[in-house]
A protein has these predicted regions:
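N-terminal Rossmann NAD(P)H-binding glycine-rich loop of SDR-like oxidoreductase domains
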Residues: 2-29
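Residues in the short beta-alpha loop(s) of Rossmann-like NAD(P)-binding domains
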Residues: 38-39, 220
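SDR active-site strand-loop-helix element
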Residues: 12, 35, 77, 115-120, ...
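Conserved glycine-rich Rossmann-like NAD(P)H-binding loop of the short-chain dehydrogenase/reductase
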Residues: 30-38
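A short helix->loop->beta-strand "cap" motif at the edges of active sites that frequently abuts
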Residues: 109-114, 146-147
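Structural motif
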Residues: 8, 72-73, 114
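Oxidoreductase cofactor-interface core, primarily capturing Rossmann-like NAD(P)-dependent enzymes
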Residues: 2, 17, 22, 45, ...
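NAD(P)H-binding glycine-rich loop region in Rossmannoid oxidoreductase-like domains
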Residues: 40, 47-110, 121-125
Length: 223
C-alpha cells in the first residue's frame, strides 16, 4: 500500500529562534520548507528529515511564488524591523505590507489551503498603537486574495535565544534602574514557545479555525 504523502508547509520567517523551533517541531508530522532571508543564514542551518531550508528574497514576487509552489499551508512569521539594502528608503510598515502582499498573492495563485499568521498583542499608548495598526494591516494584506487566514495574537513569547528574552535579561542584569514609557507599563500574559507551537498545530488540523482570530497567552498575568 503506497505511503500517504505528507502535507507540505512553508514557514516564512524561519530565521529566528521562534521560526526555527516551529519548523523543526512541525517536521515531525509535515514536510516543511523553512525560509530564511539570506544565503548567509542558510549556511548556518542543517537539514533534517522532512525539513529543508531555503533562502528567499521576500521582495521578489517571482522568488516567493517559486518557493510556495506545491505547499499546502503557509506559516507567516515575518516581521520587518529595519530597512534593507533593497528598500533603504522605505518605512518598515511599507515593507511589511509589500512582503505580505507577495506571499498572499502567491498563496492564492498556488492554491494554498490556509495561512497562519503569528502577530502580537500590544496594549495602550502611542507607540504600541502604531505597531498594532501595522500588524492588523499585515493580517488584512494576507487575507485580501481569499486564502483562509488564521491569526494568532501573542504577547511575549518565551523562547530560548529570542530577541525579547535576551533584551529582558540584559536589562535586568545590567541596569539597576530603568525608565520605561507608559505603554510598556502594562500587564502582560507571556506564553511559552511550546504552547505557541501547539496552537499552530491545532489550527492546521481544525478547519473551524480558518478566517478566525485568537489571542493566546500563558496562565500567568505579569507586570
Amino acid at each position: 500500500m503506497p505511503q500517504q504523502r505528507r502535507r507540505k508547509i512553508l514557514v516564512a520567517g524561519a530565521g529566528g529562534s521562534i521560526g526555527s523551533a516551529v519548523s523543526r517541531a512541525l517536521a515531525k508530522q509535515y514536510e516543511v520548507v523553512a525560509l530564511v532571508g539570506s544565503h548567509e543564514q542558510l549556511q548556518e542551518r542543517e537539514p533534517a528529515p522532512f525539513l529543508s531550508w531555503r533562502a528567499c528574497e521576500p521582495f521578489s514576487r517571482r522568488d516567493v511564488e517559486k518557493v510556495i509552489t506545491g505547499c499546502d499551508y503557509l506559516i507567516y512569521l515575518v516581521h520587518t524591523r529595519v530597512p534593507t539594502a533593497r528598500m533603504d528608503q522605505a518605512e518598515c510598515e511599507d515593507m511589511d505590507l509589500l512582503i505580505a502582499d507577495n506571499f498572499a498573492r502567491s498563496a492564492n495563485r498556488q492554491g494554498v489551503k490556509q495561512i497562519i499568521y503569528l502577530g502580537g498583542i500590544i496594549q495602550g499608548g502611542n507607540i504600541s498603537s502604531e505597531l498594532l495598526e501595522r500588524r492588523n494591516e499585515v493580517a488584512e494584506a494576507l487575507s485580501i486574495y481569499g486564502t483562509p487566514l488564521t491569526v494568532l495574537r501573542a504577547g511575549l513569547v518565551v523562547a530560548p535565544g529570542s530577541n525579547a528574552v535576551r533584551l529582558l535579561a540584559n536589562i535586568a542584569t545590567r541596569l539597576p534602574i530603568v525608565l520605561i514609557p507608559q505603554w510598556a507599563d502594562k500587564r502582560q500574559q507571556p506564553i511559552a514557545l511550546p504552547d505557541v507551537i501547539r496552537a499552530i498545530s491545532y489550527c492546521l488540523t481544525n478547519h473551524e479555525t480558518r478566517n478566525t482570530n485568537y489571542d493566546i497567552g500563558g496562565p500567568m498575568v505579569l507586570t
